[in-house]
Amino acid sequence: MKFPAFAYXR
């Protein structure tokens, strides 16, 4: 994942 998954909670 190139995006912060922890921030999206996804």
Swiss-Prot record:
It catalyses: quinoline + A + H2O = quinolin-2(1H)-one + AH2. Pathway: Xenobiotic degradation; quinoline degradation. Keywords: FAD, Flavoprotein, Oxidoreductase. Its EC number is 1.3.99.17. The keyword Nucleotide-binding does not apply. It is an enzyme of class 1 (oxidoreductase). Its cofactor is FAD. GO terms for molecular function: quinoline 2-oxidoreductase activity. Binds 1 FAD per subunit. Heterohexamer of two alpha chains, two beta chains, and two gamma chains. Converts (3-methyl-)-quinoline to (3-methyl-)2-oxo-1,2-dihydroquinoline. This is Quinoline 2-oxidoreductase beta chain.
